[in-house]
Amino acid sequence: MALANPDSLKNSNLSSLPTIAAIATPLGRGGVGVIRLSGTRAYSIACTLTGKSEFKPRMASFCRFYQADGTVVDEGLVLYFKGPHSFTGEDVIELQGHGGMILQNQLLARVFELGAKQAGAGEFSYRAFDNDKLDLVQAEAIADAIDATSAAAASSAIRSLSGEFSKKINQLLEQLIHLRLHVEAAIDFPDEEDVDFLSDGVIQGKLEQTQEKIQHVLATAKQGQLLRDGIHVVLAGRPNAGKSSLLNRLAGQERAIVTDVAGTTRDTLQETVVLNGLTLHLTDTAGLRETEDTVERIGIERARTAITQADILLMVYDVTCDLEEEITPLQLAEQLFGELPEAKCLLIIANKSDLLNHNSSKGMTSISQEEIYNRGYEQVNVSCETGAGIDDLVETLCAKVGFHPPENSLIARTRHLDALRRTAEYLAEAHEQLTVFKAGELVAESLRQAQHSLGEITGEFSADDLLGKIFGSFCIGK
């Protein structure tokens, strides 16, 4: 269910908003199921539902939950959080009954009978944002903590939820505001002092300090975005090159079927793993070759689609295969690199490299490191059979995307990076206008745009459609 129209919520009178309700725990068999209510009628609904006349704030009360005819729907605990001292800033009720879809749905239906409306996705969090209980970064951190794919990502999300990321952004906003005031004062009162503030170096120094801090926060945010999103790694190559074996080795389990029959993999296969703290979204693909097999041909088409969506492409080849009459590994690498999005990366993976030092290596297709270097590629030697080189591969993947999160990293999203980059660009414009053209009005305008871009991160300046997209991606009940 979509989030209610932000225009109908932002800065609304709380009494005019409907009381909302939703199941806040996963549906299915479980020990406890929680239904959350928020709004002006939440308290009265709880009283009618239980037959109680009063609930003390922040005190758990054991109650039976009744249908209109007096039959018992369920029994459990009622928790009352009186606004504004609640998550949403409104009166909040939590009904903690037994888990299970039937009981939970019956209880929720009764709550709707008493006047509550179904909450939209993320609507509880939106009301918390609307009532200044949390900012946009903190609201997003709730969803990021729930969706975290690693312990490091979860910890980073909790730090963002506690306000650490917002604090960094707000400190930068404060600096920008003071800088704008300084510049605009120099413009509005040019004759008040003998000193030319646009030329004395003070504003330039403050501006450069702000630029340096923006770059530091941007670097931190890049690590946070990698922690949150991970990278998409696609395994491609000729049939029987060892792609599926490599996926199994990285995943630590037999996820893909491996046989000696070329063309065993007919479709893409996804697996998500966390290695060295970095989340890898792995995609195994069908071997690339000319074929008359209709099903295999469809798989190859899907493989090429997956390649275009890769952050890093692993072009796997088998060093024991004689490819004299086929396309060479380097030719295939260049062909695949041409299909990658701009600024994406390709690594050549030499599988069965443990056999290169054996007498049986005669006639193998191993590519010289010099030839690879001259073509601008990098090769990692691995053995899917023994596991040799796998650690080197993981370290190379981390290095390629610059993944080295600090101990106290903060979760970040792509939109945060976009806003920080735009802020940095506007500050660079301001610096040029100041140092080259001495154009105070243009400096002030660039600083205003920088402040606006930075304010988008915490929600100080955010379009309603953006808010709808962000909160609409949340769980029902959050």
UniProtKB/Swiss-Prot annotation:
Location in the cell: Cytoplasm
Binding site for Mg(2+): S244, T265
Gene3D superfamilies assigned: P-loop containing nucleotide triphosphate hydrolases, Probable tRNA modification gtpase trme, domain 1, tRNA modification GTPase MnmE domain 2
Top EC class, one word: hydrolase
GO molecular function terms listed in the Swiss-Prot or TrEMBL record: GTP binding; GTPase activity; metal ion binding
TrmE-type G domain location: 230-402
Residues reported in the UniProt entry to bind GTP: 240-245, 259-265, 284-287
Cofactor-binding details, from the entry: Binds 1 potassium ion per subunit.
GO cellular component terms given for this protein: cytosol
Keyword Iron (UniProt): no
InterPro entries given in the database record: G_TrmE (IPR031168), GTP-bd (IPR006073), GTP-bd_TrmE_N (IPR018948), GTPase_MnmE (IPR004520), MnmE_dom2 (IPR027368), MnmE_helical (IPR025867), P-loop_NTPase (IPR027417), Small_GTP-bd (IPR005225)
Required cofactor(s): K(+)
The EC number(s) this enzyme carries: 3.6.-.-
Binding site for (6S)-5-formyl-5,6,7,8-tetrahydrofolate: R36, E94, K133, K478
Major subcellular location class: cytoplasm
UniProt: K(+) binding residues: N240, T259, V261, T264
Pfam assignment, any one: TrmE_N
Function: Exhibits a very high intrinsic GTPase hydrolysis rate. Involved in the addition of a carboxymethylaminomethyl (cmnm) group at the wobble position (U34) of certain tRNAs, forming tRNA-cmnm(5)s(2)U34.
Record note on quaternary structure: Homodimer. Heterotetramer of two MnmE and two MnmG subunits.
Protein name: tRNA modification GTPase MnmE
